[in-house]
Amino acid sequence: MVHRPRLLCLHGGGASSQIMRVQFSKLESALRKTFQLVFLEGPLDSAPGPGVLPFFEDFGPYSCWVSDDKSLLPEEKRKEENNAIAYIKTFMLQYGPFAGILGFSQGARATASILLEQQREAFTHDALFGVFFCGTFPPFIPDAPDISLPTVHILGLTDPYLRESEELLEHCTQQSVRRVIKFNGGHHMPTSSDVTQKIADVITMTYRTSQRKKVSNIWRKKVPDCRSLALES
């Protein structure tokens, strides 16, 4: 049996893995022959996020990766961010391998953080790439360097968070592969079948690029064998 590469999907703040599966249903169908999408639930309880109500009123409870509580002390905020990174890394090590990570809104911040962790000190053998949908900024790692792993950026031209999506794009070095798709829409997944197929094609292309990069760089890097469990599909 041929196993499809897995893509980890991280939902937006105040949403859920179930909501993201609905939002990504067209993209999941377009990618089904090549990839298996795995949807992870955020670690913290949350109020419904932007655009969640009223359509997803019956899809609670809602969760997030970090809270938007402005009363948190800096050390409390940093603890939340560290916990989110550790939570995602633990899941990836237990249920990997994963070929890439797809993040929507706050989930894009989480995705960027995991890519930066992999650059800083590789925690997995996987050749990761990231896909940012309507991404917000910044990552959960303060004063982080640019992301040098391959990335895809999906930007809504009327998204109120467009500037943050552009900041995230600027945070990815031009020396690496970074592909950009813009669509006429706001802070949501593109609904056009043509745009969805284009995104699927670019994700597949970026996956192949990341695999070639893995082969070319494999002699440079020593990665500890720390994966504890692989989940068979």
From Swiss-Prot:
Q: List UniProt keywords, sorted A-Z.
A: Hydrolase
User: What EC class does the entry list?
Assistant: hydrolase
Q: What induces it?
A: Expressed under high amounts of nitrogen via regulation by GLN1. Moreover, components of the fungal-specific velvet complex VEL1, VEL2 and LAE1 act also as positive regulators of expression. Finally, expression is induced under acidic conditions in a PACC-independent manner.
- Summarize what gene deletion causes: Does not alter fusarin C production.
Record-level GO BP terms? secondary metabolite biosynthetic process
InterPro entries hit by this protein: AB_hydrolase_fold, FSH-like_dom, LovG
Q: Tell me which residues this entry annotates as catalytic.
A: S105 (charge relay system), D159 (charge relay system), H187 (charge relay system)
Give start-end ranges for the coiled-coil region(s).
Answer: none
Molecular function as annotated in GO: hydrolase activity
Q: List the EC numbers from the record.
A: 3.1.2.-
Q: Give the record's GO CC terms.
A: cytoplasm; nucleus
Family, according to the entry, reads as follows:
Belongs to the LovG family.
Q: What is the stated purpose of this protein? A: Esterase; part of the gene cluster that mediates the biosynthesis of the mycotoxin fusarin C. Within the cluster, FUS1, FUS2, FUS8 and FUS9 are sufficient for fusarin production. The other FUS cluster members are not essential for fusarin C biosynthesis.
State the name under which the record lists this protein.
Answer: Esterase FUS5
Annotated organism of origin:
Gibberella fujikuroi (strain CBS 195.34 / IMI 58289 / NRRL A-6831) (Bakanae and foot rot disease fungus)
Lineage, opening ranks = Eukaryota, Fungi, Dikarya, Ascomycota, Pezizomycotina
